[in-house]
Structure formats: structure tokens, C-alpha cells
Amino acid sequence: MEKITDKVFGGERPLFEIHNVELDHVRITFGESGIKECSNIVCRNCYFEGKYPLWHVKGSDIRNCYFAPGSRSAIWYSDDMHMEDCVINGPKFFREMKNLSLKNVTINDADETFWGIDGLKLENVVLHEGTYPFMHCRNIKVDGLQSDAKYVFQYSRDIEIRNAKIDTKDSFWEVDNVTVYDSELNGEFLGWHSRGLRLVNCHISGEQPLCYAKDLVIENCTFDPECDRAFEYSTLQADIRGHIKSIKNPTSGRIVADSIGEVIIDENIKQPADCQILTR
């Protein structure tokens, strides 16, 4: 493998069509498409500040690198990538990719990041700011995620999440086949219009959670006092630990809690209107 060390590249496409190359302490300055149409690329201790630095790259390993705010839309259409111990300050990262893994990565502008990814693995990843991360993704595994970005995991499917802390409203909308373990989910309107959403050993806060959900499963979860009007028009099986403030018009299934503040069943309930609501 060829090695390029302590070099600076700028302008347009300075490293176009390179293959089997390691870049060490390389700086990609202002310009566009620094590393494009490449394969088998290793980046160590590199600094990226130009736009679109890694497009159409097949097979890459990126470690201890920094992506400046100017490196927007940095990594699109690049498959089989591993990134570790990196900091990202640019928006719109990671689009239309297959087999992407991140470990110990902080993304400080997560705006429109992770769109259209098939095969995503995250370990100890932090997301800040921005809107709609993880849009239209599939086959995701997460162990360790902290996120205050808005509207995460919408229109995505086949997801397993462990040890996450997610702070936003409107998370997990229109998802399909998602299981979340041992996590804290904070924000109103959680999981609306979801299909096959399963929450295990989670703590949930925010108003009107888990409405319009189909085949919702809740196992050994707790709810903050602010969680009112839960489960409206949802079909579900729920095992709730502790108290839940209020439940409104669930469509079908079974809900068990230690205590329930209020059950609202009115003329607007949808059929079959046969949900069992029980206290221990």
C-alpha cells in the first residue's frame, strides 16, 4: 500500500482515482472532492476542511481524523467504511451508503446526517444539533448513543438500539421493526405511526407518547409523570413499571401498570376498542 505523509492538498479532485493508499497527517484544504472515485483508502490523523472530501469511495478506514465545518456533505455514496475516534463539525454527512460503522465518534452538527444507509453500526457515538438524522435507513445496530439532534430515526426499519439517551420530539416516526433496550427516550410524540416498535427496560418522558402505533410492545418500562394521553389509537402489549399519568383510547391489546392516573375512553375510540387496561 502506498503511503502519503505530511502533505497538503487543495483545489478540485486532487486525489481522484487513487487506490490502495494510506494517508497519514494529510490536510485536505478548501476545494471540492478531495478523495473521489477511490478504493481501499486508509486515513490516519488527517484534517478535512474542503467540501465533499470522500465521495464514491469503496472500502475505507478512517481514524483520528477531524472534519471542519466547511467539510459539509463530506461522505456520500461510499460503501464499506469504518470510522473511529473522529470529530465531525460539518453537516449532511453519510448519505446513500452500505456497510458503515462508527466507533467513538462525535458529530457536532448532525443536520440531515445518516440518510439512506443500509447496514449501519454505531458504538459510543454522540450527535449534537441538527434535524432528521437516520432518515430512510435500514439494518442498524447501535450500542451507546447520545443524541440531542431533532427528529431522529424517521422512516427507518430493522433497527436494534442499546444504551441510548435520545432527547428530541418526534423520534421513531413511521419506523418498522425496531427494538430499543436499556435506553432513555425523552421528548413528546415518541413513536407515532410506528410498526413493530418494541421498548425493553426503557424510561420514557414527553407528552402523548406512542400514538397511532401498530403492534407496539413495551416490556418493563417506566414513564415520567408528564407522559399524558399515551397510546391513542395504538394496538399494543404493554408491561409498565410504576405509574403512568393517563392512557387515552388505545385500540386493542393489553396494558398492565402498577398504577394509572386516568383512563380516557370516549366516543372517538376506534374499533375493535377491546384493549384490556389493568393494574397490578
What are these regions (language model features)?
Residues 1-280:
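Long, distal/terminal scaffolding or interaction modules
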